[in-house]
Amino acid sequence: MESPINTSPDSVGIPAPEAALPFYDASHALHLLRGINELRSEQKFFDMTVSAGGQDFPCHRTVLAAASNYFRAMFAGRLRESHADRVELHDVSGPILSLLLDFCYTGRVTVTLENVEPLLQAADLFQFPSVKQACCAYLEQQLDVSNCLEIQDFAEAYACQGLAESTKRFILGHIAQLAQAHEVERLTFKRMLEYISDDRLCVDKEESAFQIALQWVKADPKHRQYRWPELFQYLRLPFIRRFYLLAYVESDPLVFRSPYCLQLIREARAFQSSEYDRHDWLCHRMKPRPSTGLAEILVVVGGCDQECDELVTVDCYNPQTGQWRYLAEFPDHLGGGYSIAALGNDIYVTGGSDGSRLYDCVWRYNSSVNEWTEVSPMLKAREYHSSTVLNGLLYVIASDSTERYDPTMDTWESLHPMLYPMDNCSTTSCRKKLYAIGSLEGQESMVMQCYNPDTNVWAMVNCGQLPPWSFAPKTVTLNGLIYFVRDDSPEVDVYNPSKNEWDKIPPMIQVHVGGSLAALGGKLYVSGGYDNTFELSDVVEAFDPETRSWSLMGRLPQPTFWQGSVSIFRQFMPQTQQSLDGVPSDNTNNERNIINLNRRRHHLHNHNFNELHRR
Protein backbone atom coordinates (compact mmCIF):
# COMPACT_ATOMS: atom_id res chain seq x y z
CA MET A 1 0.00 0.00 0.00
CA GLU A 2 1.42 3.39 -1.02
CA SER A 3 2.04 6.02 1.63
CA PRO A 4 0.12 9.33 1.28
CA ILE A 5 2.02 12.50 0.41
CA ASN A 6 3.12 14.32 3.53
CA THR A 7 1.85 17.93 3.26
CA SER A 8 2.88 19.06 6.69
CA PRO A 9 4.81 22.36 6.92
CA ASP A 10 7.85 20.46 8.17
CA SER A 11 8.09 18.38 5.02
CA VAL A 12 11.05 19.13 2.84
CA GLY A 13 10.16 21.32 -0.16
CA ILE A 14 6.56 21.83 0.91
CA PRO A 15 5.56 25.52 1.35
CA ALA A 16 3.94 26.84 4.50
CA PRO A 17 0.11 26.93 4.70
CA GLU A 18 0.18 30.70 4.22
CA ALA A 19 1.56 30.28 0.68
CA ALA A 20 -0.95 30.01 -2.17
CA LEU A 21 -1.03 29.87 -5.94
CA PRO A 22 -3.56 32.35 -7.34
CA PHE A 23 -4.71 31.09 -10.71
CA TYR A 24 -6.57 33.01 -13.39
CA ASP A 25 -7.59 31.64 -16.75
CA ALA A 26 -7.74 34.66 -19.05
CA SER A 27 -9.64 32.69 -21.66
CA HIS A 28 -12.27 31.38 -19.24
CA ALA A 29 -14.77 34.19 -19.90
CA LEU A 30 -14.45 33.66 -23.65
CA HIS A 31 -14.87 29.88 -23.33
CA LEU A 32 -17.87 30.37 -21.05
CA LEU A 33 -19.54 32.78 -23.48
CA ARG A 34 -18.79 30.44 -26.36
CA GLY A 35 -20.26 27.52 -24.45
CA ILE A 36 -23.44 29.42 -23.60
CA ASN A 37 -23.86 30.39 -27.25
CA GLU A 38 -23.41 26.75 -28.25
CA LEU A 39 -26.18 25.81 -25.84
CA ARG A 40 -28.33 28.43 -27.53
CA SER A 41 -27.51 27.03 -30.98
CA GLU A 42 -28.36 23.53 -29.70
CA GLN A 43 -31.58 24.92 -28.17
CA LYS A 44 -30.77 23.51 -24.75
CA PHE A 45 -31.78 24.71 -21.29
CA PHE A 46 -33.99 27.55 -22.55
CA ASP A 47 -36.19 28.84 -19.73
CA MET A 48 -38.08 31.68 -21.42
CA THR A 49 -39.02 33.35 -24.69
CA VAL A 50 -38.90 37.03 -25.62
CA SER A 51 -41.07 38.29 -28.45
CA ALA A 52 -41.06 41.43 -30.60
CA GLY A 53 -42.78 42.33 -33.85
CA GLY A 54 -44.35 38.90 -34.12
CA GLN A 55 -41.05 37.05 -33.76
CA ASP A 56 -40.21 34.72 -30.87
CA PHE A 57 -36.70 34.25 -29.48
CA PRO A 58 -36.07 31.42 -27.00
CA CYS A 59 -33.29 32.37 -24.58
CA HIS A 60 -31.81 31.99 -21.12
CA ARG A 61 -33.13 34.33 -18.45
CA THR A 62 -29.74 34.46 -16.68
CA VAL A 63 -27.90 35.52 -19.83
CA LEU A 64 -30.24 38.44 -20.48
CA ALA A 65 -30.09 39.55 -16.84
CA ALA A 66 -26.30 39.43 -16.85
CA ALA A 67 -26.03 41.38 -20.12
CA SER A 68 -28.55 44.15 -19.39
CA ASN A 69 -29.61 46.03 -16.27
CA TYR A 70 -33.01 46.47 -17.91
CA PHE A 71 -33.63 42.72 -17.99
CA ARG A 72 -32.05 42.24 -14.56
CA ALA A 73 -34.55 44.68 -13.07
CA MET A 74 -37.39 43.04 -15.02
CA PHE A 75 -36.60 39.51 -13.84
CA ALA A 76 -35.62 40.39 -10.28
CA GLY A 77 -38.74 42.41 -9.53
CA ARG A 78 -42.23 41.43 -8.53
CA LEU A 79 -43.81 42.13 -11.89
CA ARG A 80 -45.45 39.45 -13.96
CA GLU A 81 -42.42 39.29 -16.28
CA SER A 82 -40.21 38.08 -13.42
CA HIS A 83 -41.73 34.59 -13.61
CA ALA A 84 -43.44 34.56 -17.02
CA ASP A 85 -42.28 32.03 -19.59
CA ARG A 86 -42.94 34.47 -22.41
CA VAL A 87 -42.32 38.24 -22.43
CA GLU A 88 -43.61 40.57 -25.13
CA LEU A 89 -41.30 43.56 -25.79
CA HIS A 90 -42.58 46.76 -27.36
CA ASP A 91 -40.85 49.71 -29.08
CA VAL A 92 -38.43 47.37 -30.84
CA SER A 93 -38.61 45.37 -34.04
CA GLY A 94 -37.84 41.68 -34.34
CA PRO A 95 -34.63 42.12 -36.38
CA ILE A 96 -33.23 44.71 -33.96
CA LEU A 97 -34.06 42.55 -30.93
CA SER A 98 -32.33 39.66 -32.69
CA LEU A 99 -29.17 41.79 -32.98
CA LEU A 100 -29.25 42.61 -29.27
CA LEU A 101 -29.78 38.96 -28.32
CA ASP A 102 -26.88 37.96 -30.55
CA PHE A 103 -24.79 40.53 -28.71
CA CYS A 104 -25.81 39.01 -25.36
CA TYR A 105 -24.45 35.63 -26.44
CA THR A 106 -21.43 36.70 -28.51
CA GLY A 107 -20.44 40.25 -27.56
CA ARG A 108 -20.60 41.13 -31.25
CA VAL A 109 -22.90 43.33 -33.33
CA THR A 110 -22.68 44.78 -36.83
CA VAL A 111 -23.78 48.41 -37.20
CA THR A 112 -24.95 49.53 -40.63
CA LEU A 113 -26.46 52.65 -42.14
CA GLU A 114 -29.84 50.89 -42.21
CA ASN A 115 -29.92 49.70 -38.60
CA VAL A 116 -27.90 52.32 -36.70
CA GLU A 117 -30.85 54.51 -35.69
CA PRO A 118 -33.25 51.80 -34.42
CA LEU A 119 -30.33 49.86 -32.91
CA LEU A 120 -29.19 52.88 -30.90
CA GLN A 121 -32.76 53.53 -29.76
CA ALA A 122 -33.16 49.92 -28.63
CA ALA A 123 -29.73 49.85 -26.97
CA ASP A 124 -30.69 52.97 -25.06
CA LEU A 125 -34.09 51.55 -24.04
CA PHE A 126 -32.83 48.11 -22.98
CA GLN A 127 -29.61 49.46 -21.47
CA PHE A 128 -26.83 48.07 -23.64
CA PRO A 129 -24.32 50.95 -23.21
CA SER A 130 -21.52 49.41 -25.28
CA VAL A 131 -23.86 48.84 -28.23
CA LYS A 132 -25.09 52.40 -27.89
CA GLN A 133 -21.49 53.64 -27.91
CA ALA A 134 -20.74 51.58 -31.02
CA CYS A 135 -23.68 53.21 -32.79
CA CYS A 136 -22.42 56.65 -31.74
CA ALA A 137 -18.95 55.87 -33.10
CA TYR A 138 -20.49 54.76 -36.40
CA LEU A 139 -22.59 57.93 -36.71
CA GLU A 140 -19.54 60.06 -35.96
CA GLN A 141 -17.74 58.40 -38.88
CA GLN A 142 -20.67 59.19 -41.18
CA LEU A 143 -20.84 62.92 -40.37
CA ASP A 144 -21.13 65.25 -43.34
CA VAL A 145 -22.83 68.52 -44.22
CA SER A 146 -26.02 66.78 -45.33
CA ASN A 147 -26.70 64.90 -42.08
CA CYS A 148 -24.88 66.66 -39.23
CA LEU A 149 -27.85 68.77 -38.12
CA GLU A 150 -30.11 65.71 -37.78
CA ILE A 151 -27.40 63.70 -36.04
CA GLN A 152 -26.93 66.39 -33.39
CA ASP A 153 -30.68 66.43 -32.67
CA PHE A 154 -30.72 62.63 -32.56
CA ALA A 155 -27.68 62.46 -30.27
CA GLU A 156 -29.16 64.92 -27.80
CA ALA A 157 -32.53 63.16 -27.80
CA TYR A 158 -30.85 59.95 -26.61
CA ALA A 159 -28.31 61.59 -24.28
CA CYS A 160 -25.29 60.69 -26.41
CA GLN A 161 -23.14 63.46 -25.01
CA GLY A 162 -19.93 62.50 -26.79
CA LEU A 163 -21.63 62.24 -30.18
CA ALA A 164 -23.56 65.46 -29.59
CA GLU A 165 -20.39 67.37 -28.76
CA SER A 166 -18.37 65.96 -31.68
CA THR A 167 -21.27 66.71 -34.03
CA LYS A 168 -21.46 70.26 -32.72
CA ARG A 169 -17.73 70.69 -33.34
CA PHE A 170 -18.25 69.42 -36.88
CA ILE A 171 -21.10 71.88 -37.45
CA LEU A 172 -19.12 74.82 -36.06
CA GLY A 173 -16.16 73.84 -38.22
CA HIS A 174 -18.26 73.54 -41.39
CA ILE A 175 -20.66 76.43 -40.87
CA ALA A 176 -19.59 78.08 -44.13
CA GLN A 177 -20.47 74.95 -46.14
CA LEU A 178 -23.77 74.65 -44.30
CA ALA A 179 -24.59 78.24 -45.20
CA GLN A 180 -23.59 77.70 -48.81
CA ALA A 181 -25.86 74.65 -48.98
CA HIS A 182 -28.67 76.68 -47.34
CA GLU A 183 -28.77 74.16 -44.49
CA VAL A 184 -28.52 76.89 -41.84
CA GLU A 185 -31.80 78.36 -43.06
CA ARG A 186 -33.81 75.50 -41.53
CA LEU A 187 -32.24 75.80 -38.09
CA THR A 188 -34.39 76.69 -35.11
CA PHE A 189 -33.64 79.98 -33.38
CA LYS A 190 -32.25 78.10 -30.38
CA ARG A 191 -29.76 76.27 -32.61
CA MET A 192 -28.78 79.39 -34.53
CA LEU A 193 -28.15 81.25 -31.29
CA GLU A 194 -26.12 78.32 -29.98
CA TYR A 195 -23.79 78.39 -33.00
CA ILE A 196 -23.42 82.16 -33.42
CA SER A 197 -22.57 82.64 -29.74
CA ASP A 198 -19.89 79.92 -29.73
CA ASP A 199 -16.23 80.99 -29.80
CA ARG A 200 -15.46 77.94 -31.95
CA LEU A 201 -17.61 79.08 -34.88
CA CYS A 202 -15.18 78.64 -37.76
CA VAL A 203 -15.28 81.76 -39.93
CA ASP A 204 -12.36 83.41 -41.69
CA LYS A 205 -13.58 86.82 -40.53
CA GLU A 206 -16.41 88.12 -38.36
CA GLU A 207 -18.13 89.55 -41.43
CA SER A 208 -18.91 85.96 -42.42
CA ALA A 209 -20.66 85.34 -39.09
CA PHE A 210 -22.79 88.43 -39.72
CA GLN A 211 -23.71 87.20 -43.20
CA ILE A 212 -24.70 83.76 -41.89
CA ALA A 213 -26.90 85.26 -39.17
CA LEU A 214 -28.49 87.59 -41.72
CA GLN A 215 -29.07 84.70 -44.13
CA TRP A 216 -30.97 82.80 -41.43
CA VAL A 217 -33.27 85.75 -40.64
CA LYS A 218 -33.96 86.63 -44.27
CA ALA A 219 -34.91 83.02 -45.06
CA ASP A 220 -38.14 83.65 -43.11
CA PRO A 221 -38.28 87.35 -42.20
CA LYS A 222 -41.93 87.30 -41.16
CA HIS A 223 -41.28 84.91 -38.28
CA ARG A 224 -37.62 85.61 -37.57
CA GLN A 225 -36.88 89.33 -37.77
CA TYR A 226 -38.06 89.94 -34.20
CA ARG A 227 -35.29 87.53 -33.12
CA TRP A 228 -32.59 89.57 -34.86
CA PRO A 229 -31.48 91.82 -31.95
CA GLU A 230 -30.96 88.81 -29.70
CA LEU A 231 -28.89 87.11 -32.39
CA PHE A 232 -27.05 90.30 -33.31
CA GLN A 233 -25.69 90.80 -29.79
CA TYR A 234 -23.57 87.64 -30.07
CA LEU A 235 -21.66 88.86 -33.13
CA ARG A 236 -18.14 90.11 -32.42
CA LEU A 237 -18.88 93.51 -33.96
CA PRO A 238 -15.68 95.26 -32.77
CA PHE A 239 -13.66 92.96 -35.04
CA ILE A 240 -15.62 93.75 -38.20
CA ARG A 241 -13.74 96.18 -40.44
CA ARG A 242 -14.84 99.79 -40.01
CA PHE A 243 -15.81 100.21 -43.65
CA TYR A 244 -17.88 97.02 -43.63
CA LEU A 245 -19.48 97.99 -40.33
CA LEU A 246 -20.71 101.25 -41.85
CA ALA A 247 -21.46 100.16 -45.41
CA TYR A 248 -23.10 96.77 -44.80
CA VAL A 249 -23.95 96.26 -41.14
CA GLU A 250 -25.26 99.60 -39.92
CA SER A 251 -27.03 100.30 -43.21
CA ASP A 252 -29.06 97.08 -43.10
CA PRO A 253 -32.74 97.76 -42.23
CA LEU A 254 -32.70 95.06 -39.56
CA VAL A 255 -29.94 97.03 -37.81
CA PHE A 256 -30.80 100.70 -38.26
CA ARG A 257 -34.44 100.10 -37.30
CA SER A 258 -33.41 98.60 -33.97
CA PRO A 259 -32.26 100.99 -31.19
CA TYR A 260 -30.54 98.11 -29.41
CA CYS A 261 -28.59 97.12 -32.54
CA LEU A 262 -27.50 100.73 -33.05
CA GLN A 263 -26.31 100.79 -29.45
CA LEU A 264 -24.12 97.76 -30.18
CA ILE A 265 -22.78 99.51 -33.30
CA ARG A 266 -21.77 102.51 -31.16
CA GLU A 267 -20.08 100.15 -28.73
CA ALA A 268 -18.09 98.57 -31.57
CA ARG A 269 -17.03 101.98 -32.86
CA ALA A 270 -15.92 103.02 -29.37
CA PHE A 271 -13.83 99.87 -29.17
CA GLN A 272 -12.24 100.50 -32.56
CA SER A 273 -11.40 104.10 -31.61
CA SER A 274 -9.89 102.89 -28.29
CA GLU A 275 -12.53 104.74 -26.26
CA TYR A 276 -13.88 101.47 -24.85
CA ASP A 277 -11.79 99.91 -22.09
CA ARG A 278 -12.13 96.20 -22.76
CA HIS A 279 -10.53 95.29 -19.42
CA ASP A 280 -12.82 97.52 -17.39
CA TRP A 281 -16.00 96.34 -19.12
CA LEU A 282 -15.57 92.65 -19.91
CA CYS A 283 -17.87 91.36 -22.64
CA HIS A 284 -17.99 88.35 -24.96
CA ARG A 285 -18.21 90.71 -27.95
CA MET A 286 -14.66 91.87 -27.21
CA LYS A 287 -13.25 88.38 -27.70
CA PRO A 288 -12.32 87.46 -31.30
CA ARG A 289 -13.01 83.98 -32.59
CA PRO A 290 -9.79 81.90 -32.83
CA SER A 291 -10.59 80.87 -36.42
CA THR A 292 -10.10 84.47 -37.59
CA GLY A 293 -6.42 84.30 -36.61
CA LEU A 294 -6.82 87.30 -34.33
CA ALA A 295 -5.82 86.81 -30.71
CA GLU A 296 -5.34 88.88 -27.60
CA ILE A 297 -1.67 88.54 -26.77
CA LEU A 298 0.71 89.52 -24.00
CA VAL A 299 3.53 91.81 -25.12
CA VAL A 300 6.64 92.11 -22.96
CA VAL A 301 8.94 95.07 -23.64
CA GLY A 302 12.52 95.52 -22.47
CA GLY A 303 13.64 94.92 -18.91
CA CYS A 304 16.95 93.57 -17.64
CA ASP A 305 18.46 90.09 -17.83
CA GLN A 306 20.48 88.12 -15.29
CA GLU A 307 23.61 90.18 -16.03
CA CYS A 308 21.55 93.35 -15.44
CA ASP A 309 22.01 94.23 -19.11
CA GLU A 310 19.19 96.43 -20.39
CA LEU A 311 17.12 94.71 -23.06
CA VAL A 312 15.47 96.22 -26.12
CA THR A 313 13.63 93.01 -26.95
CA VAL A 314 9.88 92.82 -27.54
CA ASP A 315 8.23 89.40 -27.12
CA CYS A 316 4.61 88.38 -27.52
CA TYR A 317 2.80 85.40 -26.03
CA ASN A 318 -0.41 83.81 -27.27
CA PRO A 319 -2.24 82.05 -24.41
CA GLN A 320 -4.35 80.09 -26.91
CA THR A 321 -1.30 78.28 -28.26
CA GLY A 322 1.21 78.77 -25.44
CA GLN A 323 3.73 80.06 -27.99
CA TRP A 324 6.14 82.98 -27.89
CA ARG A 325 7.27 85.09 -30.83
CA TYR A 326 9.47 88.11 -30.95
CA LEU A 327 8.33 91.37 -32.49
CA ALA A 328 10.32 94.30 -33.84
CA GLU A 329 12.95 95.29 -31.31
CA PHE A 330 12.88 98.68 -29.68
CA PRO A 331 14.91 100.94 -32.04
CA ASP A 332 16.54 103.06 -29.34
CA HIS A 333 18.18 102.73 -25.94
CA LEU A 334 15.35 102.00 -23.49
CA GLY A 335 17.34 102.92 -20.42
CA GLY A 336 15.54 102.82 -17.10
CA GLY A 337 12.49 104.45 -15.59
CA TYR A 338 10.39 104.35 -18.77
CA SER A 339 6.66 103.62 -18.77
CA ILE A 340 4.58 101.49 -21.13
CA ALA A 341 0.87 101.56 -22.01
CA ALA A 342 -1.37 100.09 -24.71
CA LEU A 343 -3.70 102.40 -26.61
CA GLY A 344 -5.92 100.24 -28.78
CA ASN A 345 -3.59 97.81 -30.52
CA ASP A 346 -0.63 100.17 -30.37
CA ILE A 347 1.96 100.36 -27.60
CA TYR A 348 3.49 103.58 -26.28
CA VAL A 349 6.82 103.81 -24.44
CA THR A 350 7.37 107.15 -22.71
CA GLY A 351 10.39 108.76 -21.08
CA GLY A 352 13.12 107.09 -19.08
CA SER A 353 16.79 108.00 -18.68
CA ASP A 354 20.31 106.79 -19.37
CA GLY A 355 21.46 107.64 -15.86
CA SER A 356 22.61 111.15 -16.70
CA ARG A 357 19.90 112.52 -18.97
CA LEU A 358 16.10 112.34 -18.79
CA TYR A 359 14.14 111.46 -21.93
CA ASP A 360 11.05 113.25 -23.23
CA CYS A 361 10.77 110.98 -26.27
CA VAL A 362 7.71 108.84 -27.00
CA TRP A 363 7.83 105.72 -29.15
CA ARG A 364 4.78 104.07 -30.68
CA TYR A 365 4.61 100.43 -31.76
CA ASN A 366 2.20 99.92 -34.66
CA SER A 367 1.07 96.31 -34.34
CA SER A 368 -0.46 96.18 -37.82
CA VAL A 369 2.94 96.70 -39.49
CA ASN A 370 5.21 95.51 -36.64
CA GLU A 371 7.12 98.78 -36.56
CA TRP A 372 8.29 101.35 -34.00
CA THR A 373 8.08 105.06 -34.82
CA GLU A 374 8.75 108.16 -32.76
CA VAL A 375 5.83 110.53 -32.14
CA SER A 376 5.64 113.97 -30.55
CA PRO A 377 7.69 114.19 -27.35
CA MET A 378 6.18 114.82 -23.95
CA LEU A 379 6.01 118.38 -22.67
CA LYS A 380 8.48 117.44 -19.96
CA ALA A 381 11.31 114.91 -19.81
CA ARG A 382 10.71 112.42 -17.02
CA GLU A 383 11.50 109.01 -15.51
CA TYR A 384 9.78 106.68 -13.04
CA HIS A 385 6.43 108.14 -14.01
CA SER A 386 3.26 106.21 -14.77
CA SER A 387 1.14 106.02 -17.90
CA THR A 388 -2.36 104.75 -18.55
CA VAL A 389 -5.16 105.07 -21.11
CA LEU A 390 -8.66 106.50 -20.73
CA ASN A 391 -11.26 107.32 -23.39
CA GLY A 392 -8.80 106.82 -26.24
CA LEU A 393 -6.17 109.19 -24.78
CA LEU A 394 -2.79 108.49 -23.19
CA TYR A 395 -2.17 109.98 -19.74
CA VAL A 396 1.27 110.43 -18.17
CA ILE A 397 1.25 111.07 -14.43
CA ALA A 398 4.21 112.12 -12.30
CA SER A 399 4.56 113.63 -8.84
CA ASP A 400 4.61 117.22 -10.10
CA SER A 401 2.65 117.16 -13.36
CA THR A 402 0.09 115.39 -15.53
CA GLU A 403 -0.13 115.52 -19.31
CA ARG A 404 -2.31 113.90 -21.94
CA TYR A 405 -1.61 112.72 -25.50
CA ASP A 406 -4.12 112.68 -28.35
CA PRO A 407 -2.99 110.09 -30.95
CA THR A 408 -5.25 111.47 -33.70
CA MET A 409 -3.68 114.95 -33.41
CA ASP A 410 -0.23 113.79 -32.25
CA THR A 411 -0.28 116.49 -29.59
CA TRP A 412 0.27 116.76 -25.83
CA GLU A 413 -1.56 119.02 -23.41
CA SER A 414 -0.80 119.85 -19.80
CA LEU A 415 -3.39 119.01 -17.14
CA HIS A 416 -3.77 119.85 -13.49
CA PRO A 417 -1.16 118.06 -11.39
CA MET A 418 -2.13 115.73 -8.57
CA LEU A 419 -3.55 117.36 -5.48
CA TYR A 420 -0.65 116.03 -3.43
CA PRO A 421 2.65 115.03 -5.09
CA MET A 422 3.43 111.31 -4.76
CA ASP A 423 6.66 109.39 -5.24
CA ASN A 424 6.76 106.49 -7.74
CA CYS A 425 3.01 106.36 -8.10
CA SER A 426 1.14 103.62 -9.93
CA THR A 427 -1.94 104.45 -12.00
CA THR A 428 -4.85 102.77 -13.71
CA SER A 429 -8.17 103.80 -15.23
CA CYS A 430 -11.44 102.45 -13.86
CA ARG A 431 -15.02 103.40 -14.71
CA LYS A 432 -14.10 106.55 -16.63
CA LYS A 433 -11.68 107.89 -14.00
CA LEU A 434 -7.95 107.70 -13.27
CA TYR A 435 -6.66 106.32 -9.98
CA ALA A 436 -3.14 106.95 -8.68
CA ILE A 437 -1.61 105.22 -5.67
CA GLY A 438 1.68 106.07 -4.01
CA SER A 439 3.43 107.54 -0.99
CA LEU A 440 3.19 111.25 -0.31
CA GLU A 441 6.35 113.07 -1.32
CA GLY A 442 8.91 112.77 1.46
CA GLN A 443 6.62 110.58 3.59
CA GLU A 444 5.96 106.88 4.06
CA SER A 445 2.17 107.08 4.23
CA MET A 446 0.26 105.80 1.19
CA VAL A 447 -2.71 107.60 -0.36
CA MET A 448 -4.96 107.19 -3.39
CA GLN A 449 -5.99 110.07 -5.61
CA CYS A 450 -8.56 110.17 -8.40
CA TYR A 451 -8.73 112.26 -11.58
CA ASN A 452 -11.99 113.12 -13.34
CA PRO A 453 -11.32 113.94 -17.03
CA ASP A 454 -14.68 115.68 -17.38
CA THR A 455 -13.78 118.31 -14.78
CA ASN A 456 -9.97 118.15 -15.03
CA VAL A 457 -9.85 117.88 -11.24
CA TRP A 458 -7.86 115.64 -8.91
CA ALA A 459 -9.32 114.57 -5.56
CA MET A 460 -8.32 112.38 -2.64
CA VAL A 461 -10.10 109.03 -2.47
CA ASN A 462 -11.67 108.43 0.91
CA CYS A 463 -11.32 104.65 0.80
CA GLY A 464 -10.64 103.95 4.45
CA GLN A 465 -7.51 102.30 5.78
CA LEU A 466 -5.17 101.28 2.96
CA PRO A 467 -3.46 97.87 3.12
CA PRO A 468 0.00 97.92 4.77
CA TRP A 469 2.09 98.36 1.62
CA SER A 470 5.82 98.95 1.93
CA PHE A 471 6.06 100.18 -1.65
CA ALA A 472 3.54 101.43 -4.18
CA PRO A 473 2.01 98.26 -5.65
CA LYS A 474 1.49 97.62 -9.33
CA THR A 475 -2.09 98.27 -10.39
CA VAL A 476 -4.40 97.02 -13.10
CA THR A 477 -8.15 97.21 -13.69
CA LEU A 478 -10.34 94.24 -14.48
CA ASN A 479 -14.12 94.41 -14.78
CA GLY A 480 -14.64 97.40 -12.52
CA LEU A 481 -12.16 96.30 -9.85
CA ILE A 482 -8.64 97.62 -9.21
CA TYR A 483 -6.07 94.96 -8.36
CA PHE A 484 -2.97 95.90 -6.35
CA VAL A 485 -0.07 93.46 -6.75
CA ARG A 486 2.65 93.84 -4.15
CA ASP A 487 6.32 93.77 -5.03
CA ASP A 488 7.57 92.25 -1.78
CA SER A 489 4.78 89.77 -1.09
CA PRO A 490 2.52 87.31 -2.95
CA GLU A 491 -0.54 89.04 -1.47
CA VAL A 492 -2.94 90.85 -3.80
CA ASP A 493 -5.48 93.45 -2.70
CA VAL A 494 -8.65 94.45 -4.56
CA TYR A 495 -10.55 97.74 -4.43
CA ASN A 496 -14.09 98.24 -5.70
CA PRO A 497 -14.56 101.98 -6.46
CA SER A 498 -18.31 101.63 -6.96
CA LYS A 499 -18.84 100.16 -3.49
CA ASN A 500 -15.76 101.73 -1.87
CA GLU A 501 -14.83 98.30 -0.50
CA TRP A 502 -11.55 96.40 -0.07
CA ASP A 503 -11.02 92.69 -0.54
CA LYS A 504 -8.24 90.14 -0.98
CA ILE A 505 -7.75 87.35 -3.46
CA PRO A 506 -5.68 84.19 -2.94
CA PRO A 507 -1.92 84.91 -2.95
CA MET A 508 0.23 84.42 -6.03
CA ILE A 509 2.21 81.23 -6.55
CA GLN A 510 5.40 83.22 -5.90
CA VAL A 511 6.51 86.81 -5.41
CA HIS A 512 7.57 88.85 -8.44
CA VAL A 513 9.95 91.54 -7.16
CA GLY A 514 10.50 93.87 -10.11
CA GLY A 515 8.09 91.84 -12.22
CA SER A 516 5.35 93.05 -14.52
CA LEU A 517 1.55 93.11 -14.45
CA ALA A 518 -1.05 93.15 -17.24
CA ALA A 519 -4.70 92.27 -17.88
CA LEU A 520 -5.34 89.75 -20.64
CA GLY A 521 -8.45 87.79 -21.59
CA GLY A 522 -10.27 88.58 -18.36
CA LYS A 523 -7.30 87.43 -16.25
CA LEU A 524 -4.39 89.02 -14.40
CA TYR A 525 -0.94 88.12 -15.75
CA VAL A 526 2.14 88.57 -13.56
CA SER A 527 5.55 87.75 -15.03
CA GLY A 528 9.25 87.73 -14.25
CA GLY A 529 11.01 89.52 -11.43
CA TYR A 530 12.80 87.93 -8.49
CA ASP A 531 11.13 85.03 -6.68
CA ASN A 532 10.97 84.04 -3.01
CA THR A 533 14.62 82.89 -3.05
CA PHE A 534 15.65 86.09 -4.86
CA GLU A 535 16.47 84.15 -8.00
CA LEU A 536 15.56 85.89 -11.24
CA SER A 537 12.42 84.21 -12.54
CA ASP A 538 10.85 83.57 -15.93
CA VAL A 539 7.50 82.43 -14.49
CA VAL A 540 4.26 83.75 -15.98
CA GLU A 541 1.24 83.13 -13.77
CA ALA A 542 -2.36 84.24 -14.14
CA PHE A 543 -5.33 84.80 -11.85
CA ASP A 544 -8.81 83.84 -13.05
CA PRO A 545 -11.52 85.83 -11.21
CA GLU A 546 -14.14 83.21 -12.06
CA THR A 547 -12.31 80.40 -10.28
CA ARG A 548 -10.45 82.71 -7.88
CA SER A 549 -7.26 80.75 -8.46
CA TRP A 550 -3.75 81.27 -9.82
CA SER A 551 -2.20 78.98 -12.42
CA LEU A 552 1.14 78.74 -14.19
CA MET A 553 0.60 79.92 -17.79
CA GLY A 554 4.11 79.58 -19.16
CA ARG A 555 7.58 81.07 -18.99
CA LEU A 556 9.23 84.14 -20.43
CA PRO A 557 11.82 83.55 -23.18
CA GLN A 558 14.39 84.44 -20.52
CA PRO A 559 14.36 85.47 -16.85
CA THR A 560 13.69 89.22 -16.78
CA PHE A 561 12.96 92.03 -14.35
CA TRP A 562 11.79 95.65 -14.71
CA GLN A 563 10.11 94.77 -18.00
CA GLY A 564 6.88 96.35 -19.14
CA SER A 565 3.90 94.28 -20.25
CA VAL A 566 0.57 95.06 -21.91
CA SER A 567 -2.01 93.20 -23.99
CA ILE A 568 -3.14 93.94 -27.54
CA PHE A 569 -4.95 92.17 -30.37
CA ARG A 570 -2.85 90.92 -33.25
CA GLN A 571 -2.81 88.31 -35.99
CA PHE A 572 -0.94 85.47 -34.33
CA MET A 573 -1.32 82.21 -36.21
CA PRO A 574 0.03 79.17 -34.34
CA GLN A 575 3.28 77.59 -35.47
CA THR A 576 3.42 73.82 -35.66
CA GLN A 577 6.29 72.49 -37.73
CA GLN A 578 8.76 75.30 -37.90
CA SER A 579 10.21 77.33 -35.08
CA LEU A 580 11.04 80.99 -35.29
CA ASP A 581 14.45 80.16 -36.72
CA GLY A 582 13.18 77.78 -39.37
CA VAL A 583 14.36 74.77 -37.35
CA PRO A 584 11.86 72.01 -36.53
CA SER A 585 10.52 72.54 -33.03
CA ASP A 586 8.90 69.87 -30.88
CA ASN A 587 7.81 71.99 -27.95
CA THR A 588 7.65 75.43 -26.44
CA ASN A 589 11.01 75.02 -24.68
CA ASN A 590 12.73 74.64 -28.05
CA GLU A 591 11.06 77.85 -29.22
CA ARG A 592 12.27 79.70 -26.15
CA ASN A 593 15.79 78.34 -26.57
CA ILE A 594 15.91 79.50 -30.19
CA ILE A 595 14.64 82.95 -29.20
CA ASN A 596 17.35 83.17 -26.55
CA LEU A 597 20.04 82.01 -29.01
CA ASN A 598 19.08 84.67 -31.53
CA ARG A 599 18.95 87.25 -28.76
CA ARG A 600 22.38 86.26 -27.49
CA ARG A 601 23.88 86.54 -30.96
CA HIS A 602 22.30 89.96 -31.38
CA HIS A 603 23.53 91.07 -27.94
CA LEU A 604 27.10 89.94 -28.67
CA HIS A 605 27.02 91.72 -32.02
CA ASN A 606 25.94 94.98 -30.40
CA HIS A 607 28.48 94.56 -27.60
CA ASN A 608 31.34 94.00 -30.06
CA PHE A 609 30.18 96.94 -32.17
CA ASN A 610 30.12 99.24 -29.14
CA GLU A 611 33.57 98.09 -28.02
CA LEU A 612 34.94 98.74 -31.49
CA HIS A 613 33.32 102.18 -31.52
CA ARG A 614 34.92 103.06 -28.16
CA ARG A 615 38.38 102.22 -29.52
Curated annotation (Swiss-Prot):
Residues 148-249 form the BACK domain. Pfam families: BACK, BTB, Kelch_1, Kelch_6. One of its GO terms (molecular function) is ubiquitin-like ligase-substrate adaptor activity. GO terms for biological process: cell division; chromosome passenger complex localization to spindle midzone; proteasome-mediated ubiquitin-dependent protein catabolic process; protein ubiquitination; regulation of cytokinesis. InterPro entries: BACK (IPR011705), BTB-kelch_protein (IPR017096), BTB/POZ_dom (IPR000210), BTB/POZ_KLHL21 (IPR030577), Kelch-typ_b-propeller (IPR015915), Kelch_1 (IPR006652), KLHL21_BACK (IPR047069), SKP1/BTB/POZ_sf (IPR011333). GO terms for cellular component: Cul3-RING ubiquitin ligase complex; cytoplasm; polar microtubule. Keywords: Cell cycle, Cell division, Cytoplasm, Cytoskeleton, Kelch repeat, Mitosis, Repeat, Ubl conjugation pathway. Residues 46-113 form the BTB domain. This is Kelch-like protein 21. It comes from Xenopus laevis (African clawed frog).
